[in-house]
Amino acid sequence: MLSIAIGADSAAIDLKNTITDYLQQKGLTVTDYSYDPTGENPIYPDVAYTLAHAIKDGKHQRGILLCGTGIGMCIVANKVNGIRAAQCHDTYSAQRARKSNNAQVIALGARVIGPELAKEIIGAWLDAEFEGGGSAPKVEKIGYYEHQEKHQ
């Protein structure tokens, strides 16, 4: 069974709650990374960085990040070596994020899409699997570049 990490900033708490319920109804285990340990409102860099590291460290197989647009969360998650995050606002992009890019993290914007479309997008992403094939060398090249950056 997939273990899903979810995280949201203050702009997307309602959507996060809706998505969490949706995932739990599908029988998935969901861990929430939305809360700031200081008791302050969560800010997207902290949420995305913590969640991305939880994926990298093997605590969860997939991660869902939610903020106003999905942009900031996606940028931060992609700063963590080994993480491939994709901002998606349609089902086709979500499927391709998994099938072609092996994205372990998806980022969505609560101010861009509504809850029903968000559920469809996440469902499409969860149902898709990495195809390998011609995409495998491209994903490997991403890892190569990450390694180069780390050692410069």
From Swiss-Prot:
Gene3D superfamilies: Sugar-phosphate isomerase, RpiB/LacA/LacB. InterPro entries: RpiB, RpiB_LacA_LacB, RpiB_LacA_LacB_sf, SPI_LacAB/RpiB. The keyword Glycosyltransferase does not apply. GO terms for biological process: carbohydrate metabolic process. Pathway: Carbohydrate metabolism. It catalyses: D-erythrulose 4-phosphate = D-erythrose 4-phosphate. The keyword Metal-binding does not apply. GO terms for molecular function: intramolecular oxidoreductase activity, interconverting aldoses and ketoses. It is an enzyme of class 5 (isomerase). Pfam families: LacAB_rpiB. The active site is at 67 (proton acceptor). Its EC number is 5.3.1.34. Keywords: Carbohydrate metabolism, Isomerase. It comes from the Bacteria. Belongs to the LacAB/RpiB family. PANTHER family: RIBOSE 5-PHOSPHATE ISOMERASE (PTHR43732:SF1), RIBOSE 5-PHOSPHATE ISOMERASE-RELATED (PTHR43732). NCBIfam families: PRK05571.1, rpiB, rpiB_lacA_lacB. Involved in catabolism of D-apiose. Catalyzes the isomerization of D-erythrulose 4-phosphate to D-erythrose 4-phosphate. This is D-erythrulose-4-phosphate isomerase.
